[in-house]
């Protein structure tokens, strides 16, 4: 009997104190007392607090719960759309329920307990909000609430994705828990997507948590809140859900075409002479590259944006030299300022620092972190960059340590200090959004001739609207971490922020003379070729990280993939326009295109690069084959042209020089001429590869390659349609124009087959040559 009692007690304690299960303790029911219809939704008075549903569109519903009757006003930072067009919706009220219906959704609120059930128009349950709670608490001296939502998942087999980039090596978060908190290598975005065809945008900037460790229960919670606030976004396709997120938080602008080329970087170039020498050698060797990067410690002291003259005697001349050689230069800039400089003293006097503390072994005591929440401090920060760097021609901004960097999560500077906006814990995840907005808005106000490009180590919801890409942080240089980058990048991309890259080869260590490390670098570079951005970086034992640093055999392979990247620029740049204008995502987990195929739910090491390419990174040393799942479709081996039917797994050939790549039937892939930088020559002729076996469409996009005239309509598109039944290709009338546009061009049409239209090299015998002058042409096989 005693043993039985002990077991009961142990079970009870485990239930009460298991992480995430505290919210599952019994709470009194919170019935609906009254309902008020408003112009854009309904407000329900509850026994405890109030619940409000706002109909934003047919597929987007905002849900808010307040512990008091009123909904306090607050300043929005993440969501920038507050004026929604009128949407037709209906409300039905019975003794048991209140139902809000749109053309796509039905939302059922139970009167007995105020639970909320989201259904599609057919009545299929998508998501259930079973309970919400707001628990009074004190955080960083502020009286506030801990917010939590509970959803029961009994009988649901859905998978969960998104939440930003995390390094656990997990793609499908079913059965997992994730801290939504910023730190080096973990980028948190409060946006969750379900294979049931919906997304939840959790509108809170404090440290939060997703917890599904108990498979039949989902908890979403935040440390600081006045109101529990989220948006329910319905697809069911993921592109539509992501499009809804961007409608809320902003669309990503186009980068300059150069940004989609190759980025050469290492830790670090130490002198002007070294940097220019590397750039000149790339041009001498005719290796394609657009961008070179100056990492940290170019300054004479941190926070003072002045080059160390002993190592960089002529910064304007250096930039001019790079531009003459068709390079763009990105430079590292940090949010920390060192005592003892004029800039530090001036910022301190103005109250522009959040805190002054030791934040790491390489930072001196009393380092100041600028207050990116202060609009005047943001202007000041950009002005430093503008006067010292942008005005001499710098092209891109590497914003490092934008979490901001701290010793650990528990001593996060924001959590324990006050900002210009108030309690830092309330805005703990928002620093990267605010600091990228400082640079984006600053450069946009300074010039419209050069598109903003920011590479940030962290991001938050909305950062995509600031022209911000991210890299995956300071990851190790080994196979384990390489493998983890694939699901990390896929989850970041599906979180609505489309531009992601990684330190090819890893950041921490790596010896280019070591044959084993060379293999890792090659495989990582092959993967990186099909990332939204192609970039090498790292700390190498030889201090060499250029493509010729890895030996002649490796160099041949690396340059071949670099060449492929440049041939694919018409395809990649057109995808970038789709991303800006249509809510598209270039790097796509298989579930994005094959959501109803249950076998794709947990495949996080294969992905689609745009509509055509399935990419299958090789993540095991010494591998010569790669187990690959092909969803139901006809697929072509990119290297051989051989076709294979899907809905099965195969062992794809994967010798060191070949990354397994398959192209889906119905794809139309434009490949441009080989070039050494993105704008060396016009995209003419274009080899147009047609992968027969299904109908297909593709739209080629072109503009001036830089500047913001595209926002004013200065761009052109050409639509291609393949009709598989008729075996005919229609090249439509060109739409739009811009200065410098090609008015006449040649399309080399290639109907891909075995050993025809394959690999990197242009097809020597195209099937059709089409002279195009902007008017529709129909091409038959």
What are these regions (language model features)?
Residues 124-658, 663-664:
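Catalytic-domain carbohydrate-binding cleft regions of carbohydrate-active enzymes
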Residues 8-20:
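Bacterial N-terminal signal peptides
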Residues 23-249, 253-258, 265-267, 274, ...:
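N-terminal accessory segment at the very beginning of proteins
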Residues 1-9:
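Bacterial N-terminal signal peptides that target proteins for export
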């Amino acid at each position: 009997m005693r043993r039985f009692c002990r077991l009961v007690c142990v079970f009870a304690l485990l239930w009460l104190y298991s992480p995430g299960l505290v919210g599952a303790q019994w709470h009194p029911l919170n019935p609906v007392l009254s309902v008020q219809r408003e112009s854009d939704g309904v407000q329900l008075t509850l026994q405890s607090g109030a619940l409000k549903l706002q109909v934003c569109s047919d597929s987007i519903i905002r849900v808010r719960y307040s512990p008091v009757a009123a909904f306090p006003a607050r300043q929005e930072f993440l969501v920038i759309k507050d004026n929604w067009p009128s949407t037709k919706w209906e409300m039905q009220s019975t003794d048991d329920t209140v139902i809000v219906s749109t053309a796509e959704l039905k939302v059922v609120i139970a009167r007995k307990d105020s639970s909320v059930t989201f259904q599609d128009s057919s009545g299929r349950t998508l998501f259930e909000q079973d309970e919400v709670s707001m628990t009074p608490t004190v955080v960083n001296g502020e009286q506030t609430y801990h917010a939590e939502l509970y959803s029961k998942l009994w009988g649901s087999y859905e998978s969960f994705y998104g939440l930003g980039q995390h390094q656990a090596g997990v793609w499908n978060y079913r059965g997992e828990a994730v801290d939504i908190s910023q730190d080096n290598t973990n980028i948190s975005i409060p946006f969750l997507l379900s294979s049931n065809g919906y997304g939840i945008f959790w509108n809170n900037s404090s440290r939060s948590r997703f917890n599904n460790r108990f498979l039949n229960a989902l908890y979403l919670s935040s440390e600081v809140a006045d109101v529990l606030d989220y948006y329910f976004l319905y697809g069911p396709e993921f592109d539509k859900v992501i499009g809804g997120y961007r409608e809320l938080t902003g669309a990503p602008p186009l980068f300059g075409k150069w940004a989609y080329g190759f980025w050469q970087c290492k830790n670090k170039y130490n002198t002007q002479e070294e940097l220019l020498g590397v750039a000149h050698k790339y041009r001498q060797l005719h290796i394609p590259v657009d961008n070179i990067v100056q990492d940290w410690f170019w300054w004479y002291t941190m926070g003072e944006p002045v080059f160390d003259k002993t190592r960089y005697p002529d910064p304007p001349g250096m930039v001019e030299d790079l531009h003459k050689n068709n390079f763009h230069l990105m430079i590292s800039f940090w949010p920390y300022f060192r005592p003892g400089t004029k800039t530090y003293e001036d910022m301190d006097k103005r109250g522009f620092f959040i805190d002054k503390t030791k934040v790491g072994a390489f930072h001196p005591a009393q380092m100041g972190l600028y207050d990116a929440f202060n609009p005047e401090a943001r202007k000041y920060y950009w002005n430093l960059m503008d006067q010292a760097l942008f005005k001499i021609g710098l092209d891109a901004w590497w914003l490092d340590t934008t979490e901001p960097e701290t010793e650990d999560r528990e001593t996060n500077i924001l959590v324990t200090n006050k900002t210009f906006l108030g309690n830092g814990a309330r805005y703990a995840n928002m620093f990267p959004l605010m600091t990228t907005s400082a640079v984006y808005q600053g450069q946009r106000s300074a010039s419209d001739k050069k598109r903003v490009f920011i590479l940030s180590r962290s991001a938050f919801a909305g950062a995509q609207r600031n022209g911000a890409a991210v890299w995956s942080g300071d990851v190790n240089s080994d196979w384990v971490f390489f493998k983890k980058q694939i699901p990390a990048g896929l989850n970041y991309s599906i979180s609505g922020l489309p531009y992601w890259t990684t330190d090819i080869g890893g950041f921490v260590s790596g010896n280019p003379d070591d044959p084993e490390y060379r293999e890792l670098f090659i495989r990582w570079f092959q993967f990186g070729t099909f990332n939204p951005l192609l970039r090498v970086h790292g700390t190498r034992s030889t201090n060499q990280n250029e493509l010729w640093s890895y030996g002649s055999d490796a160099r041949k392979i690396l340059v071949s993939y670099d060449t492929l990247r440049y041939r694919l620029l018409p395809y990649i740049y057109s995808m970038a326009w789709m991303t800006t204008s249509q809510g598209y995502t270039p790097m796509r987990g298989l579930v994005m295109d094959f959501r109803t195929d249950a076998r794709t739910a947990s495949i996080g090491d294969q992905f689609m690069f745009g509509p055509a390419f399935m990419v299958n990174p090789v993540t095991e040393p010494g591998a010569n084959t790669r187990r690959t799942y092909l969803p139901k479709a006809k697929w072509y081996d990119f290297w051989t042209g051989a076709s294979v039917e899907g809905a099965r797994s195969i062992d794809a050939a994967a010798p060191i020089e070949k990354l397994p790549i398959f192209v889906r039937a119905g794809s139309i892939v434009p490949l441009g001429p080989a070039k050494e930088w993105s704008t060396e020559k016009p995209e003419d002729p274009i080899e147009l590869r047609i992968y027969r076996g299904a109908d297909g469409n593709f739209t080629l996009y072109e503009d001036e390659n830089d500047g913001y005239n595209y926002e004013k309509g200065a761009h052109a598109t050409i639509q291609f349609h393949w009709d598989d039944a008729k075996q005919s290709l229609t090249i439509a009338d060109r739409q739009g124009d811009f200065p410098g546009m090609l008015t006449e061009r040649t399309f080399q049409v290639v109907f891909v087959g075995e050993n025809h239209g394959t690999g990197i090299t242009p097809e020597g015998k195209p099937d059709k040559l089409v002279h195009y002058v902007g008017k529709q042409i129909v091409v038959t096989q």
